[in-house]
């Protein structure tokens, strides 16, 4: 396959990630405003500042974003996300925004992460509904995701539903302590929930196989996906 043209913006995060990707793959770089040849394969970080529009027009793309595990530090305050460092892992996905977790990869990369796996919970008081950002609602064209998903979940369970997003005051880690299940569009927080013994369910077609909402009262955590996901994320040094 041809080397991708790396599309960068003026944002520091995008420029840093794109520069490192281009350096590692020996690829050419092009500013998002100057890119016109949509027959080319591209690579870029994030979906803001014109990158999503380019992604929609090309046939093949590599998408870069925060990883599945051991992500870089971030804070979420006043409706803004602040990246505290770039020491964590970043995912790279071909022709999608997130990996489906399928495959038969070994466990060597997963072991390097030193993750702590908790056994699947057998009890729980409520279901966490992880609300996607407005940006992701637009990307996936699901403007009424929260309302539609609440209705869907209520078809299969009468458990209490707690809506949570990255700006919620109560930390997700605290909520997971008494949660029965975690439901999201495609949030990587779903994998953190699984690490904490809370089964995750996704509405995105790419991830639906991990947990189907119709099975929310008889959940099973498939730990095999973690080996595969660990092979889809890298540090800047790598």
Regions found by a protein language model. Give the residues of each.
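A short, gly/pro- and small-residue-rich
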Residues: 48-80, 147, 195-209
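Short loop/turn segments at strand-loop or loop-helix junctions that form parts
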Residues: 9, 64-68, 125-136, 204-205
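Donor nucleotide-activated moiety binding/catalytic core segment of transferases
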Residues: 30-36, 54, 151, 159-210
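Structural motif
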Residues: 40-41, 126, 180-181
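Conserved catalytic-core segment of nucleotide-activated headgroup transferases in glycan assembly
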Residues: 122-167
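Short catalytic/ligand-binding loop motif for oxyanion handling, primarily in non-cytosolic enzymes
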Residues: 15-17, 50-54, 69-73, 135-139, ...
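N-terminal pre-catalytic "stem/leader" segment of glycosyltransferase-like enzymes
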Residues: 1-53, 135-136
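Leloir-type glycosyltransferase catalytic cores
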Residues: 75-124, 156, 210-238
